[in-house]
């Protein structure tokens, strides 16, 4: 009995390690994971970083690609290789994010903190942002340009920095990358293909115009290979026998017709690796001690969860009155061909239905209907077409419905306890109204 319990504990510990290794691989932009289809871009980036770290050259580059294309993973791999070179032990990294550093003052404080120069700056007063930044970089100098401490500035959500007032941060970073004594590399990450159009002329003139594009250009056979590699356990996994069985199961999954159908469907909707990781994470969550190996059913259920319509799910939790208002808006969309409408128009449509079917739906007072309408707006199922003025009446504010007919009908099919007359109203032709 004791040996069986020990064996069970060892099995549970083994699965716990599997979960930890794979979740870390799926959830983090780990520099230890493999790069897929971006070897040329990686070579370009690492070469540029080495020129800054080893030879004291200043450079600037933008990494451009859609969300989930691997921009951060690519950069993390390059930085990891750079930090393994003995010459660049003293390279300093400064990470900024457009969502966090919303203006140049906040950005400057963050730069000072990451450079560990708070005690140097103390109560000094600077005339401008440029003067302050130059002072920080001078504090890092060790004589000539080649012996000074290189600084790598990484700007995530680069396009948000481009929308900041006067683009002061970008101007000064690109300026020092051309003229400063301290070697500086400025690396921007963005999903905007038109990023150069957002830059002011003075900023653009100081940018090197180097761009590295990531476009997820792999085909389905490569996607299938990535699927196998991402699910496989590494050779150094402690329990060799379990790792062998796990990897054999992954190989069988990659040849299963049901799994291939799931992956093909997922690939056709979204081929980025972030989306694949989400699918694999949901399937991995179903692996337990009693169910130690992933199956095609797990992947099918994960695919179903990935493809759920969030807006349609919100509709499942609405009241019958709110459902009636959405159906009224659906008919208005059909009549006026997607033109905006207001509350009064929706209320009139609802009243037409009530007059015909008073026995099945309670006739709510107008303020109650208005409250339900406002709740739909809070849930972002409808949105105002234009900004509301203080003097405008709420009943006549123009709005648009953010659900299409298919979403409404699918949601109604799954809506429990919906009155039959309401369902019939939703499917009725315009002539019925």
Swiss-Prot record:
Location in or out of the cell: Nucleus
Annotated SMART domains: AAA
UniProt entry tagged with the keyword ATP-binding: yes
Sites bearing N6-methyllysine, chain numbering: 7
Keywords, in A-Z order: ATP-binding, DNA replication, DNA-binding, Methylation, Nucleotide-binding, Nucleus
GO BP, sorted A to Z: DNA replication; DNA replication initiation; polar body extrusion after meiotic divisions; protein polymerization
Binding annotation for ATP: 65-72
Gene3D superfamilies given in the database record: P-loop containing nucleotide triphosphate hydrolases (3.40.50.300)
Gene Ontology CC terms, in alphabetical order: chromosome, telomeric region; cytoplasm; cytosol; nuclear origin of replication recognition complex; nucleolus; nucleoplasm
Keyword Lipid biosynthesis: no
InterPro entries recorded: AAA+_ATPase, AAA_16, ORC4, ORC4_C, P-loop_NTPase
The protein's role, per its UniProt record: Binds histone H3 and H4 trimethylation marks H3K9me3, H3K27me3 and H4K20me3. Component of the origin recognition complex (ORC) that binds origins of replication. DNA-binding is ATP-dependent. The specific DNA sequences that define origins of replication have not been identified yet. ORC is required to assemble the pre-replication complex necessary to initiate DNA replication.
Protein's UniProt name: Origin recognition complex subunit 4
Lineage of origin: Eukaryota, Metazoa, Chordata, Craniata, Vertebrata
């Amino acid at each position: 009995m004791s040996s069986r319990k020990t064996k069970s504990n060892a099995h549970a510990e083994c699965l716990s390690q599997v979960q930890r290794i794979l979740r870390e691989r799926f959830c983090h932009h780990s520099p230890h994971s493999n790069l897929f289809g971006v070897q040329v871009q990686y070579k370009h980036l690492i070469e540029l970083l080495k020129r800054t770290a080893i030879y004291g050259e200043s450079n600037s580059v933008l990494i451009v690609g859609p969300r989930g294309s691997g921009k951060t993973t690519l950069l993390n791999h390059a930085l990891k290789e750079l930090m393994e070179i003995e010459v660049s032990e003293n390279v300093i990294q400064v990470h900024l994010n457009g969502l966090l550093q919303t203006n140049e003052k906040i950005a400057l404080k963050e730069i000072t903190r990451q450079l560990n120069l708070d005690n140097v700056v103390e109560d000094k007063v600077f005339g401008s942002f440029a003067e302050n930044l130059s002072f920080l970089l001078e504090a890092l100098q060790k004589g000539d340009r080649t012996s000074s401490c290189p600084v790598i500035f990484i700007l995530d959500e680069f396009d948000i920095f481009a929308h900041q007032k006067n683009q002061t941060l970008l101007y000064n970073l690109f300026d020092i990358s051309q003229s400063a004594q301290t070697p500086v590399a400025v690396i921007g990450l963005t999903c905007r293909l038109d990023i150069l159009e957002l830059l002011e002329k003075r900023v653009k003139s100081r940018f090197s115009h180097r761009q590295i594009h990531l476009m997820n250009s792999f085909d389905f056979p490569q996607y299938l290979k990535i699927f196998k590699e991402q699910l496989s356990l590494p050779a150094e996994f402690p329990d060799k026998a379990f790792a062998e069985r796990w990897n054999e199961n992954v190989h069988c999954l990659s040849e299963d017709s049901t799994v291939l159908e799931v992956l093909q469907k997922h690939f056709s909707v979204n081929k980025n690796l972030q989306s694949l990781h989400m699918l694999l994470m949901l399937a991995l969550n179903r692996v337990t001690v009693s169910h130690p190996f992933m199956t095609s059913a797990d992947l099918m259920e994960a695919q179903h969860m990935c493809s759920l319509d969030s807006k349609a799910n919100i509709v499942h939790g609405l009241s019958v009155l709110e459902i009636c208002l959405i159906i009224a808006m659906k008919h208005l969309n059909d009549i006026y061909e997607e033109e905006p409408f207001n509350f009064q128009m929706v209320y009139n449509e609802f009243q037409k239905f009530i007059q015909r079917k008073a026995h099945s739906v309670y006739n709510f007072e107008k303020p109650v209907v208005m409250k339900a309408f406002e709740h739909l707006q809070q849930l972002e199922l409808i949105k105002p077409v234009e900004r509301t003025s203080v003097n405008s009446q709420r009943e006549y504010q123009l709005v648009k419905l953010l659900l299409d007919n298919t979403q409404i009908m699918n949601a109604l099919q799954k809506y429990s306890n919906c009155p039959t007359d309401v369902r019939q109203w939703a499917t009725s032709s315009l002539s019925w109204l």
